[in-house]
């Protein structure tokens, strides 16, 4: 079950029956850019293809432009995802394992990384549609294996994210207690590899 949270967070664009317009993509990018940084608590509910709740959780989410985000699941089991601007680190304390990949790899695997990425070429690979205060993001290449995500706003405040994965599971994330990143919170985007953990380095680039 722990993998559900890690995959959901990382895969963190839903699926709508409304047509995609270029204007929706542009408007979403503007909204995300206006959120230069964000820290919030989240509550997560995961339902399966039969709409049965299979897990709940809570934790802390943060983002900062460009290319930095932080996802710390604190209950029921701990896991951590940190994008430091170049690499994405996925830490499972229970398994004592860290996986690391390039940011671009993470975007290809999971469009949630688009929340802090403004590259036009990357965005051009996704359809974006809008219904009221929510935006649905899905890969244009249906064979890419990418997930679909919905993000919702209250005015310019990001309040909700919904993920549908390839197995039909839906993860609903509600954000509360939003604040701007300040002071020591900048350290959230710096991942220090713990001692005595296995490192699965999946980066395509040459490592230092």
Curated annotation (Swiss-Prot):
Primary residence: periplasm
Signal peptide: 1-22
Keywords: Chaperone, Periplasm, Protein transport, Signal, Transport
Family classification: Belongs to the LolA family.
Function of the molecule: Participates in the translocation of lipoproteins from the inner membrane to the outer membrane. Only forms a complex with a lipoprotein if the residue after the N-terminal Cys is not an aspartate (The Asp acts as a targeting signal to indicate that the lipoprotein should stay in the inner membrane).
One GO process term, biological-process aspect: lipoprotein transport
One Pfam short name: LolA
Membrane spanning residue stretches: none
Gene Ontology CC: outer membrane-bounded periplasmic space
Quaternary structure and interacting proteins, as annotated: Monomer.
Name of the protein described by the UniProt record: Outer-membrane lipoprotein carrier protein
Location(s) in or outside the cell: Periplasm
């Amino acid at each position: 079950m722990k993998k559900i949270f890690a995959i959901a967070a990382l895969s963190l664009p839903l699926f709508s029956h409304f047509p995609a317009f270029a204007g929706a993509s542009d408007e979403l990018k503007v909204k995300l850019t206006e959120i230069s940084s964000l820290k919030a608590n989240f509550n997560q509910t995961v339902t399966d293809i039969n709409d049965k709740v299979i897990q709940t959780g809570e934790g802390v989410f943060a983002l900062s432009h460009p290319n930095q985000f932080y996802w710390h699941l604190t209950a029921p089991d701990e896991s951590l995802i940190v994008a430091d601007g170049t690499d994405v680190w996925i830490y499972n304390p229970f398994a004592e394992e860290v996986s690391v990949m390039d940011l671009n790899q993470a975007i290809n695997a999971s469009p949630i990384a688009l929340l802090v990425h403004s590259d036009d070429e990357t965005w051009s690979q996704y359809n974006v549609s809008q219904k009221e205060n929510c935006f649905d993001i899905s890969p244009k290449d249906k064979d890419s294996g990418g997930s679909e995500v919905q993000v919702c706003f209250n005015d310019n405040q990001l309040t909700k994210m919904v993920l549908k994965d390839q197995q039909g599971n839906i993860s609903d994330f509600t954000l509360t207690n939003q604040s701007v990143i300040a002071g020591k919170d900048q350290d959230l985007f710096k991942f220090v590899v713990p001692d005595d953990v296995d490192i699965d380095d999946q980066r395509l680039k040459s490592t230092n």
